[in-house]
């Protein structure tokens, strides 16, 4: 095919995206919905960079308003220094995509221009070619769960997932909330399952999720509630999503910006897949050290699907390396990316950056088989890209 590179890029940029893991909330849920340039600058990626780049007083910084913090971050990371990190480049991509001239301007000037755009979440979805996003919803947070008490928001765009970390980390709180909602139960396990039935009916989640460090992963199958939860997930035909390798509060003073990487033994992931072959397992690992083994495991377990480049893995140099590895070992049988966005505007840069990398990687693979006399067509490329950005997620979540 002539103009292969241009064809791949065009198809990728025109394909609708299913974003399988975010922390977004609809605009109607104002307490939790985050949007705008101030929220983008106040994200913990940039806060951690600020703390380690300057000698700023951390406690005083956290007492400031969002706008005051944003001003400091803009001055320190974008005006006094070259904004060359991936987190900084993300901000520049958003501003550039929205045609905001940011050079030599203060935060207040940029904020003023940004606010004039008055972007809705639906407009950002359109800019980013996002068809649907999966939220992260904690059924053991009463305030957050109010989202499902009044569904005056687009339930087709925003899909639910159940974040179950509190069952492992804050059991007494979970049991108290379950008891407030369930009158009759046989034992604690029955209580939890009946509560999960209730929140399932309220939210219609597409998967349940857990974020685990290595100790939690090793003890996962020994937890007395896990067998019943996995059986419940099987009955509901929804996967379990495992985010593996976070080490919380590496630096407690940094608060949300203080989490780091834990060493993971993926033997225990393989055991979960073996012991529960009828449960679908989504998995993303935080450390580069785990990516090769994780990819090999995805070749060995039919019920395991890799997704995305999570958090510290979401760096262009690492994405290029591991994206090639996954294609070489798995073909197109994986979910290449999720945004992990907490601020709606982050969708713009997260997906622009990834699509550029995906385009280059796919072109090289297509060009390689074309040299070997395989005739690739635009229809095939379009089908492949749709699988990667949309259909693989839909199929694994039983939504298609």
Can you annotate each of these PLM segments?
Residues 259-268, 285-291, 314-319:
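A general structural motif
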Residues 215-268:
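Acidic, glycine-rich loop-and-beta core segments that form the ion-binding/anion-interacting portion
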Residues 2-231, 236, 279, 295-400:
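Metal-cofactor-binding active-site regions of metalloenzymes
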Residues 240, 284-300:
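Aromatic-lined glycan-binding groove of carbohydrate-active enzymes
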Residues 242-248, 283-287, 308-310, 337-341:
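Active-site proximal loops enriched in glycine and acidic residues that flank catalytic Cys/His/Asp
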Residues 145, 162-169, 252-274:
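Extended hydrophobic/aromatic segments used for targeting, binding, or gating
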């Amino acid at each position: 095919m002539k103009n292969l590179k241009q064809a791949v890029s065009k198809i990728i940029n025109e394909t609708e995206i299913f974003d399988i893991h975010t922390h977004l909330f609809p605009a109607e849920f104002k307490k939790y919905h985050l949007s705008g340039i101030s929220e983008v600058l106040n994200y913990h990626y940039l806060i951690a960079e600020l703390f380690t780049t300057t000698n700023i007083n951390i406690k005083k910084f956290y007492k400031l308003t969002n706008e005051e913090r944003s001003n400091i971050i803009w001055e320190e990371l974008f005006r006094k220094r070259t904004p060359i990190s991936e987190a900084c480049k993300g901000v520049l991509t958003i501003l550039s995509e929205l045609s905001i001239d940011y050079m030599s301007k203060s935060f207040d000037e940029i904020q003023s221009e940004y606010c004039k755009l008055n972007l809705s979440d639906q407009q950002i979805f359109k800019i980013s070619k996002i068809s649907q996003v999966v939220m992260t919803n904690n059924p053991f947070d009463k305030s957050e769960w109010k989202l499902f008490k009044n569904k005056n928001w687009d339930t087709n765009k925003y899909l639910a997932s159940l974040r179950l970390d509190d069952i492992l980390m804050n059991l007494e709180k979970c049991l108290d909330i379950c008891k407030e909602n369930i009158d009759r139960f046989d034992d604690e396990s029955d209580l939890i399952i009946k509560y999960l039935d209730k929140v399932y009916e309220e939210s219609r989640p597409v998967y349940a999720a857990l974020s685990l460090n290595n100790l939690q992963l090793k003890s996962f199958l020994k937890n007395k509630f896990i067998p019943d939860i996995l059986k419940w997930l099987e009955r509901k035909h929804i996967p379990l999503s495992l985010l593996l390798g976070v080490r919380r509060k590496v630096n407690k003073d940094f608060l949300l910006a203080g989490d780091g990487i834990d060493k993971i033994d993926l033997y225990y992931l393989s055991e979960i897949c073996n012991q529960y072959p009828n449960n679908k397992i989504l998995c993303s690992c935080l450390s580069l050290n785990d990516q090769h083994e994780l990819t090999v495991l995805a070749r060995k377990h039919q019920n395991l699907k890799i997704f995305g480049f999570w958090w510290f893995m979401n760096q262009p140099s690492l994405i290029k390396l591991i994206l090639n590895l996954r294609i070489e070992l798995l073909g197109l049988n994986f979910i290449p990316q999720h945004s992990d966005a907490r601020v709606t505007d982050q969708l713009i840069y997260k997906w622009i950056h990834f699509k550029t990398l995906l385009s280059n990687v796919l072109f090289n693979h297509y060009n390689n088989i074309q040299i070997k006399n395989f005739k690739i067509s635009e229809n095939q490329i379009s089908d492949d890209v749709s699988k990667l950005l949309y259909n693989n997620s839909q199929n694994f979540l039983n939504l298609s």
